[in-house]
Each structure stands twice: as structure tokens, then as C-alpha cells.
A protein has these predicted regions:
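Short loop/turn segments immediately following beta-strands, especially the blade-tip
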Residues: 198-205, 306-311
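Conserved beta-strand positions in repeat-built beta-propeller and related beta-rich domains
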Residues: 48-49, 54-59, 95-100, 138-148, ...
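Loop/turn-rich, solvent-exposed surfaces of beta-rich toroidal or solenoidal domains
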Residues: 194, 215-253
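Blade-level signature of beta-propeller repeat domains, shared across WD40, Kelch, NHL, RCC1
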Residues: 269-321
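A short helix->beta-strand "capping" segment at the edge of beta-propeller domains
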Residues: 21-39, 67-72, 76-78, 116-117, ...
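A short loop-to-beta-strand structural motif that recurs across blades of beta-propeller domains
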Residues: 63-65, 101-103, 152-155, 194-196, ...
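Hydrophobic alpha-helical segments and helix pairs
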Residues: 112-168
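Beta-rich, blade/repeat-based domains predominating
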Residues: 37-51, 80-95, 121-137, 166-184, ...
């Protein structure tokens, strides 16, 4: 089935500065407006080393963006329904967590195919953020579409289509990432304002021994999507916090803040040839008209250049691959 509208969006080179950080005791990093798309709910930033492309989604509008930098345009795919997150396989497919299941989008032919769908009734539930694990499965969270708390979960979806519930009673499943050595997994359930660390077993693709390693003050907003650098520091997008905050999970200390001229910052990913550029998504939803006047580029894609490098993202990989 083909459902897509293909468009090209110009790259913006405008440099912008956010308001002065309230976290005056940590370094402040400047951000730049990269692509002015004004997404309703930008999310799911992912950089793929296989094709040197950045991917992200507008959840509410059902749009997938694919941008090959530094070429100054990106492709826009309009799909039939909300998209919670995007990952890549090792071929030419984007793997999408949509409302009715997990889909594969052929980036060459634009054909959308269902891989698998949940066995249980998903009424009032949608997928949200997610990433591929070192073992090659997709770990994607769910959340209520009506605001009901503890009705979501973190689901592991294997390439053969098997769904396994890994964490239950989640309110807003959000950021998830693995440590550079693959022995830890970090996870965010947004309303808890915490980051939980788990021991991760790559061979079994399982987690054990949860413990809170970061507690985020409410005045800094709420934790949303996140990524990790080669030193093991977490870069967390703060919804309502106008920034991406760098936290040390070993100490729980805040190390730096990337200032973003948007109130609701949603996800981030290291990208570029050397994985030294931080790409940041934002949202227009959840803002008053006055806030949108103060932050007119809300919903756009931003970039920053911290003195840190990320690690490559994992692929949705079938056993034979």
C-alpha cells in the first residue's frame, strides 16, 4: 500500500540563541535552527550511519522526515496515522511504531507493509518513543491517548514479530538508550521525573535490577527522549524545560545544558560522520499562543555542537542478519 506525499524542505542556516539558562552553575551550549518544520509533536530523532540520514517523526500529523545532511533538503512521508517512533533495518526500510502495529516502509518504493500487530486490544493506547537494542529488537513504549496513568508499557518487538511486555504500569513511556558497552539500559517514564538504570543482558535481550540514577527537579521540566555519548553521559530532552540537559548517571549530577528556543523539547540524537553533532526535535503542542509568540520556531529541528560524540544506533535485525 502507498500512502505518501513526498516533499522537499529547505535547510535553514539561521543561528539562534535561547533565553539565559536557569542552570547557571553548568556550561551552557548554543543551539542553531536547522530545519524550520514547525511540527505539532516532533519526536524520535535517529541518525543512521548506513545511509548518513537523520530521521524523525511528527507523531500527531503522521509524518516521517528523512534528511541527508549536509545536502540542504529532506524528504517528508505522510502516513495514515500517528507514528510513535522510527528505527532502521540494515537494508532500505524505516521501521515505524504506528497505532495499529509495527510497519516497514520501503524508502525506495514508498511501500508500507505491516510486520506485526499486538494481540491484545490497543483501544486508547498508542506507541510512543522507542529504539533498537544491541540484540536487534525494537523496544517501544506505549501510553494512553486519554491521559490515563499507568496504562502503558514498554514492549520488546523481535524481528520475527513477537511482542513481549518488559515493563508494565507505565504512564508515558519515553526515552530509552543503552550504555556504550551494552551492559546497562536507561529508561524514562516521564511523569516520574526520573531515569531508571537496568542491568542489560545482550544474549537474552532482557533487563534486571532497576534503580533510580537521576532525579530531575520539576523546575527543569520533565524528561522526554534521550541519547548517550561515548563517555556514558545521558543527553535528555526536557519537556517544558527549553533545553537538552546532560546528566552523569553514575553521580546523578547535571553536567551541561543545551539552550533551545522552544519550551517543549522532545528528543535528541548524535549524528554526522563523526557523531559529534546533536540533533534536537521540539513540539508546538502543549504551548499557549503567548508561548508560541515567544518561541516562534517551536516544532522545528535544532542542532548543537557539544564537545562530545555519540555511539552508532542499532538496527532492527532479523536473526539471519
Amino acid at each position: 500500500m502507498r500512502f505518501f506525499l513526498l516533499a522537499f524542505i529547505p535547510l535553514t542556516t539561521l543561528t539562534v540563541m535561547a533565553q539565559q539558562s536557569q542552570s547557571t552553575d553548568v556550561p551552557s551550549i548554543r543551539s542553531h535552527l536547522c530545519i524550520d518544520v514547525k511540527a505539532t509533536l516532533g519526536e524520535g530523532a535517529l541518525y543512521c550511519m548506513h545511509d548518513s540520514c537523520l530521521y524523525w517523526v511528527d507523531i500527531e500529523e503522521g509524518i516521517l522526515y528523512q534528511c541527508r545532511l549536509p545536502v540542504q533538503h529532506c524528504r517528508r512521508f505522510k502516513l495514515p496515522g500517528r507514528i510513535g517512533t522510527v528505527v532502521r533495518d540494515k537494508n532500505h526500510h524505516a521501521i515505524l511504531a504506528m497505532e495499529t502495529g509495527i510497519y516497514s516502509l520501503d524508502l525506495h518504493t514508498e511501500e508500507l507493509c505491516l510486520i506485526c500487530s499486538p494481540a491484545e486490544n490497543q483501544t486508547g493506547i498508542r506507541f510512543n518513543d522507542g529504539k533498537c537494542s544491541p540484540a536487534g529488537s525494537l523496544w517501544a513504549g506505549t501510553m494512553s491517548t486519554t491521559g490515563k496513568r499507568k496504562s502503558g508499557a514498554l514492549i520488546r518487538i523481535s524481528p520475527d514479530g513477537k511482542f513481549t511486555k518488559m515493563i508494565d504500569s507505565v504512564s508515558i513511556s519515553n526515552g530509552i538508550i543503552w550504555s556504550p558497552d551494552g551492559t546497562k539500559m536507561y529508561y524514562v517514564d516521564t511523569p516520574t521525573s526520573t531515569v531508571v538504570e537496568y542491568d542489560y543482558n545482550t544474549k537474552a535481550d532482557t533487563i534486571t535490577n532497576p534503580r533510580i540514577v537521576i532525579r530531575i527537579p520539576h523546575e527543569m521540566g520533565y524528561p522526554d527522549g534521550m541519547t548517550i555519548d561515548r563517555d556514558g553521559n545521558l543527553w535528555i530532552a526536557h519537556w517544558g524545560g527549553s533545553g537538552v540537559y546532560c546528566w552523569n548517571p553514575e553521580t546523578g549530577k547535571l553536567l551541561a545544558r543545551v539552550e533551545i528556543p522552544a519550551k517543549n523539547v522532545t528528543s535528541c540524537a548524535f549524528g554526522g560522520t563523526d557523531l559529534d553533532t546533536l540533533y534536537i526535535t521540539t513540539a508546538r503542542t502543549g504551548n499557549s499562543e503567548e508561548t508560541l509568540k515567544n518561541y516562534p520556531h517551536s516544532g522545528s529541528l535544532f542542532i548543537a555542537f557539544p564537545d562530545n560524540r555519540g555511539i552508532p544506533s542499532y538496527s532492527f535485525s532479523k536473526p539471519e542478519q
